[in-house]
Amino acid sequence: MILLIRKRTLLYTWLAVCMIGLSAIFLAGSRRAFTPTGAMGQGSSAQTVVIDPGHGGQDGGAVAGDGTEESRINLAISLQLEQLLRFAGVRTELTRREDVMVCDPGLETMRQRKVSDLHNRASFVNGVPNAVLLSIHQNSLPSSPVTHVAQTFWNRQEGAEALARTLQAGLNPAVNTHRAKEPKPIPDSIYLMNHVDAPAVLVECGFLSNREEAARLQQEDYQKTLAAVIAAGYLRWMAGEDRK
């Protein structure tokens, strides 16, 4: 137990040092920050990170064995991520701040609400000048309860693949300690990622179908670790060395 606490303390210390160092690099180089092609000519050159906590409200997403819904975990990690990015001087927006669907009122069926929710999220992202989208999700594969680890997926916009690879490079040593993963292009079936003009990365933080990983994903300390790794990866990408 003592060894576990020491390892966890070292991890948090390492992440904190990375955040401070990368924050300094980012702030020093913000005047020459990279501007994605799709965002040029939209006003300020400063990027805004749109954080998207997947699902919400009646659409709980994947469900852990104990009944915990993905949407609540997504929101908790997203709020931690927002705090870290703001601390580093990054502009942020969230598609939702509560456990609710982002759909139009008065819709009768769940299908109508889900379609509206995705359309509204895409419209929100496309309305933010010079945006970068980070969509936070949890995975599930009930047919293989031992499957675990975090993985990133990128859309077709310029810079997205590099960002996904940078985030994955941080997630592998931090949380994928037994099995490294490679980032992948997002499937065409994922509506939001394929209907935004911004570079977008979807982060599957873990598998709720894996009992041990589901328990970790519900722990605040683990959520903070994930948020810190994602924030540090974004800042590293923005610093310029991993954009191509």
Regions found by a protein language model. Name each.
Residues M1-K244:
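Catalytic-site microenvironment of enzymes
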